[in-house]
Amino acid sequence: MSNQTTPLSKDEKRRIREAKELTRLEKEKARPKRFWLWYLAYMMFILALIYIVDEVATNLPNALQTEINLAINVWPWASKNGYDVVTTWNQVYPTSTTITIEAFENQISSGLSNIGLVHTAANAMLIVSMFYRSLADKWGRKFFLFINTLGMALSLLVFFTATNFAGYIIGFFCLRFFVTPDQQVVYIFELAPKKYRNAIFSSIKGVAELGLVFIWLLRKLFLTADGTSPVEGDFYLYRWLFLAVAIAAAVIAFLALIFARESDAFLDERIAYLKQTDEERAAIKAEKDASKAQGGFISALKYTFKNKQVLWICIATAVAELCYSACNNYSNVLTYGFLGQGMHSVEQATDVTFWFPFSCAIVTFAYGFISDWIGRKKTSIVLLSSCTVFMVLEFLGLYYGWPDWIIGLLLGGVLGADWANGDVLSLMAGESCPTNIRASVMSSWSTFFGIGMILSFAISAIAPKIAGTTYLSLVYLCVSVPSWVVSLFFLMIKVKETKGTDLNTKIGQNAIDVVSETEQR
């Protein structure tokens, strides 16, 4: 007789693997929460730390764009051509009379255009992230919370080690990939009590925006008065900011791995799935396949173009996002100023980065409560109007030399209002469609958001070569203000209020119609 055992089939191996996973998840679920409020508080503390790291990591390449451009584009070019240069915060002067300042100006503008092209191309990570993000439904929120935060740290280390443009490209693509999923947001919504969910989220997000003050602190610690190290010609001090944030991100990632617990929402959903028989799973799959005619990305796009309410919200979003580069390239705006009148020193630009997180955080804290009070549409109109007024005042302040703290608060007002407006428009799109295709319509809305963002990056790639640094901010102003005004006009004329929408609207019925019927009664 043969003692050989019959190899296990794929299905048998899968069942054994799933049985082990089920045992592990049920054990995790059974862990007691004796002091639930304390557990919730410390989880929100960890998530707030991760949110701060996410915001700082996302903003750091924008906040240091001027220094990065000088380091990876202008300085290598000058060295290659044998010129001895001394750099200040925003100008590079040749000691040789054989080269003109215009040549350096052209190199600076060319470098900014190349960085803009990288940012445009990096939007491909948004598409990849859509598939990557869905893996958290199988592997768990905690695992990807750790992986994404650690990935941010590793991406920032790439920036730290990069001394050329190729290194910058790799670092930016990696960073964009890991900051896009926003796993901490999913965690917050699944852990927070339903009654206080929006309040808790807006509060944590406001704290995260306030955490941008750390950029100011790091600039104070690592950047000297003239933008160089004590060794003349070393343009790479900005890299230490990336290292500091990378270390903080790595520490917080392991804190989350050790102390965070898996969300109950994921545990309940995954355990229920693992307990299903193969027949039950097959029936559910067949039901989902049958419903693809209602949902799915293509169906959502068709619905978007047929439903005027959703279509105009999406159009207003795409138009408003043409300002994206103008808002996020604030380092260049502060450095080169408006019509040549700018900061012109590290101290001034650094002081501005101290003040803007405060006004940005105030807007972030407030908009959720205001939206529930006066309505989504009115809130979006207020935010778009605020963006327009704050940016015009910011540029006037740069030109006329207003105090740094005023410039900083105006900059924070622009950034906070613009970011908040995106959240409000997203909410309006979700509240304007029936339940059975809401998730798909949100993907459609994200597509319009991405179109506006890509066009904005394309503008930022072309503008420096055409306008140069002197008129760069004028181009940003001429793009942003009309985009906000046009978006505001579309909202006022074409879009209905969505406050009070029943998100459990029956299949096939427009949620916005339920609001109208309720108001009529």
Region spans (language model):
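Central cavity-lining transmembrane alpha-helices of secondary-active solute carriers
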Residues: 116-134, 354-366
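Glycine-rich segments within core transmembrane alpha-helices of 12-TM secondary carriers
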Residues: 179, 196-224, 248-249, 445-457
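Conserved MFS/SLC helix-loop-helix module at the cytosolic interface between two early adjacent transmembrane helices
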Residues: 128-163, 374
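Extracytoplasmic gate region of multi-pass secondary transporters
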Residues: 61-63, 307-361
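Hydrophobic core of transmembrane alpha-helices in multi-pass small-molecule transporters
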Residues: 166-179, 404-420
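Extracellular/periplasmic helix-loop-helix junction of adjacent transmembrane segments
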Residues: 65-126
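Cytosolic juxtamembrane N-terminal segment immediately preceding the first transmembrane helix
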Residues: 1-64, 84-88
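C-terminal ends and interior cores of transmembrane alpha-helices
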Residues: 150-163, 386-400
